[in-house]
């Protein structure tokens, strides 16, 4: 599996949101559905991170965290929030 940086993933998601077909791109589909649908996925994935961290191993928790980060970045793309916008608050 190829590794991506947070920045590389964000750039890829921006491209998919702008150019992807919602019928074939999960990212484009989520952005098309809007902030409410994306928000539901963020909450779902956050709960899965918690459960994996508490009851499963390191690998399961890491996988769930990666899915949470994906959905958070999709939310950022949908709302027009840049990485620099977020970095300003770190």
Curated annotation (Swiss-Prot):
Pathway: Amino-acid biosynthesis; L-histidine biosynthesis; L-histidine from 5-phospho-alpha-D-ribose 1-diphosphate: step 2/9. One of its GO terms (molecular function) is phosphoribosyl-ATP diphosphatase activity. Keywords: Amino-acid biosynthesis, ATP-binding, Cytoplasm, Histidine biosynthesis, Hydrolase, Nucleotide-binding. Its main location: cytoplasm. Its EC number is 3.6.1.31. InterPro entries: HisE, PRib-ATP_PPHydrolase-like. It holds the Pfam family PRA-PH. One of its GO terms (biological process) is L-histidine biosynthetic process. GO terms for cellular component: cytoplasm. It catalyses: 1-(5-phospho-beta-D-ribosyl)-ATP + H2O = 1-(5-phospho-beta-D-ribosyl)-5'-AMP + diphosphate + H(+). It is found in: Cytoplasm. Signal peptide: none annotated. Belongs to the PRA-PH family. HAMAP family: HisE. This is Phosphoribosyl-ATP pyrophosphatase. The gene is hisE.
């Amino acid at each position: 599996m190829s590794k991506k940086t947070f920045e590389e993933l964000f750039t890829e998601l921006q491209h998919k949101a702008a150019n992807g077909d919602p019928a074939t791109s999960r990212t484009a589909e989520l952005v098309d559905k809007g902030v409410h649908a994306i928000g539901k996925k963020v909450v779902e994935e956050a709960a899965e991170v918690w459960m994996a961290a508490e009851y499963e191993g390191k690998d399961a928790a890491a996988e769930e965290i990666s899915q949470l980060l994906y959905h958070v970045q999709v939310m950022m793309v949908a709302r027009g929030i840049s990485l620099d916008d977020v970095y300003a608050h770190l």
